[in-house]
């Protein structure tokens, strides 16, 4: 299996004087599901943001698809805690926004979308059980429904690596379990790598591997694999 994420002697945080976490060695392969747990403020979101290339490491090596530069357009999908949806637009518009990551700029400007893009958008909306809300403005949806829109948007993007920060929050337990199963089957069927930050320990342990960020003696977080 080819490595999608490789981190060696990685230090992350906001400045050299405020290192949040130190990661000696982390390798994540294609098609693998990895979960990250840990107390609030310990560096879970910061780690995801570094992998997404939204934040630079303080030190060490972090390779995504074997490169330290920014991944290709649309190759990495990120579901943040703050969803970033266009709330006055429809569910369809928001999911389409993810799908056009792989289209040309010219096509996107003029709205000339290939049928396969339209099909992907509708498939993603259907998987998240939102077909009946497809033409509804996002602002009229519940918090849980909006979260499902964000997940559908990332699925439609066709990313090879999906990073999800508490992506099941605001969902009731039954819906969260359903969405987890759909996402699990989707990434496994398409050999997509999924890295999730998850507060529910039992659900986190359903991943192929589970890691915990925990405080060391010098108050810098370290990443430890959790036995399942």
Language-model-derived ranges and their functions:
Residues 97, 151:
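Hydrophobic anchor residue at the start of the ABC signature
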């Amino acid at each position: 299996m080819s490595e999608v994420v490789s981190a060696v002697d990685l230090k992350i945080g906001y400045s050299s004087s405020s290192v949040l976490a130190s990661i000696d060695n982390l390798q994540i392969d294609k098609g693998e599901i990895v979960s990250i747990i840990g107390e609030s403020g310990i560096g879970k979101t910061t780690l995801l943001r570094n992998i997404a290339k939204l934040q630079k490491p303080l030190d060490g090596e972090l390779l995504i698809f074997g490169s330290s530069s920014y991944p290709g357009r649309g190759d990495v999908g990120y579901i943040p805690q703050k969803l970033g949806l266009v709330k006055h637009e429809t569910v369809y518009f928001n999911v389409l926004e993810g799908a056009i990551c792989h289209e040309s700029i010219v096509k996107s400007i003029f709205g000339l979308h290939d049928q396969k893009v339209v099909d992907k958008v509708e498939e993603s909306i259907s998987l998240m059980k939102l077909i009946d809300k497809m033409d509804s403005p996002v602002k009229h949806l519940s918090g849980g429904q909006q979260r499902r829109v964000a997940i559908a948007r990332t699925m439609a993007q066709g990313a090879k690596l999906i990073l999800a920060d508490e992506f099941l929050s605001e969902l009731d337990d039954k819906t969260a379990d359903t969405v987890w199963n759909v996402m699990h089957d989707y990434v496994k069927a398409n050999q997509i790598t999924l890295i999730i930050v998850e507060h529910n320990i039992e659900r986190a342990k359903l991943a192929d591997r589970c890691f915990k960020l925990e405080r060391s003696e010098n108050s810098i977080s370290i990443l430890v694999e959790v036995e399942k």
